Amino acid sequence: MKQEIPNLVICGDYNVCHEEIDIHNPKMKGVSGFLPEERTWMGDFIKSGFIDSFRYLNQEKQEYSWWSYRANSRANNKGWRLDYAMVSEPLKNSISRAYILSEAKHSDHCPIVVELDIKL
C-alpha cells in the first residue's frame, strides 16, 4: 500500500500501549493491550516505515487516550495511550503538532489530533 500511496496517515484505536510510558502501570505486562507480543507487533509496524506522531513530538510526555470506566480511572489518571495517528515516513518532517484532547469526555477514549504542514 505504501508503494501506491506513499503519504499515509492511519489513525485509530490500536488497542496497544507501545512503550512503558504509554500506560499508567507498566508492570501490567500480562494484560491484553500491553502484552509483549502486541508491543512487538506495534514496534514492527513502526519499523516498517511509520512514525508515531504523538511520540515523535512528545518523547517524554505521559498522556493517555483511554481510561477504564472502573475504579474511577479517569479521575485518577490511570490511563492507557491506545489511540495513534501513524504517519508514513515521507510525511515525518510535516508533523507540526500532535496532541491528545484529554478533557473531552464523550467516551472512554478521547480524541487525538495530528497536524501536518504540507505544501501543496
Give, region by region, the residue ranges found by the protein language model.
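Short helix-loop capping/hinge motifs at secondary-structure junctions, enriched
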Residues: L91-S94
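Metal-dependent phosphoesterases centered on the DNase I-like endonuclease/exonuclease/phosphatase
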Residues: M1-K78, L82
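Short acidic, gly/pro-rich beta-turn/loop elements at beta-sheet edges
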Residues: D22, S96, D108
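Surface polyanion/phosphate-binding segment centered on an Asp-His-Pro turn
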Residues: Y99-L120
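Hydrophobic/anchoring residues in structured secondary elements
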Residues: R55, R97-I100
